[in-house]
Amino acid sequence: VKITQNGLDSGDVSRGSPDHAVTTETSVAEQIEVFRGPATLLYGSGAIGGVVNVVDNRIAKDFVGGVRGFYGLGGDTASNRREMTAGVTADHEQSVWHFDAFTRHSGDYDAPTFINEEGESVSSVENSFIDAQGANVGVSYLFESGYLGVSYGRMEQQYGIPGHSHHDHDHDHDHDHAHDHAHEATHAEGPYADLWQNRVQVHGGWNNPSAAFKQVELRYGFTDYQHQEIEHGVAGTTFGNRQHELRLTATHEAWQGWTGALGYHFFDQEQTAAGAEAYTPDSTTRKHAAFWLLEKEHQQLNWQLGARVEDVQVNERSFTPVSASFGVTYSMNDAWLLSA
């Protein structure tokens, strides 16, 4: 499954290991989209499990009608989680400004009593704490036939890595300690990840540029990411990711009943890993791709066709993947769909 934010890659290293976090934050999102079948070829050729796209309003396409805001508080007793989110979007002359932020803290979460690796009876998953915070700011300029905007976001997160803790029995501690102190003990006794990410995105759109096209959209993203896996106060392994991504998409008018979009996708990524568990070699990846998605509705059937051609270079090796996909959905009624 590929995770994107506003149609651009999440920019983390979560696909490399199950204990690497996804950096796309859903608590301040406007909506979450799920794509399967031919539509996934707009985003890449390897998303066989689908694409999850998190959409926010940091770069607004329309005026919000004055000032609009949100706030939220959340928590639970299983991990003593405490979460707060807030955001505001405001019109100012021909521009729209946006700011949002979140903070989240939780200790080790409760679980049915089980015997751990040391043979002890415990009722919580050791080293499962999370401390995270982030903020984002964006501005867009709206004109008669489109928009242009930029956003910047920063995320910082520390989270425990369960399953890697080993007790020093000369320094046993009480397993019934309060949840709000769980992450403090875990920092000292078990490995955890210390993560940060900076993200810049630029979006632009041009409506009705010609008789053949409804809209042309440009999206660019730059991401700088790092996380360190820390044990006994020492950074054992450091992972880094810097990437540039550009997507140009043109949505065309109906042709023989078929609507759709075609475009160009550029991706440049430099991934690094150093330390005791750096099992993935450093790599530099560059991709150029062209894609086309077609869709047609006929009575209760929705037909989709997708194609993508890529020129991929990983270090000194080159590849030319070619992908095609076909899908159909049958609408049985308002509640049921059959897809193939």
Predicted regions: what is each one?
Residues G65-F70, S79, E83, G87-A193:
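Periplasmic-side early beta-strands and strand-to-turn transitions of outer-membrane beta-barrels
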Residues Q94-W97, S145-V150, P209-V216, Q256-L262, ...:
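Repeated loop/turn-to-beta-strand initiation elements of outer-membrane beta-barrel proteins
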Residues Y141, T259, A278-A340:
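Structural signature of Gram-negative outer-membrane beta-barrels, strongest in the C-terminal barrel
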Residues A86-H92, V137-Y141, V202-W206, L246-H252, ...:
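Residues on the lipid-exposed face of transmembrane beta-strands in outer-membrane beta-barrel proteins
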Residues E126-S128, A132, G146-V216, F222-E245, ...:
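Flexible loop and strand-edge segments within Gram-negative outer membrane beta-barrel domains
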Residues G69-L73, F99-A101, V139, V150, ...:
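Membrane-embedded beta-strand positions of outer-membrane beta-barrel proteins
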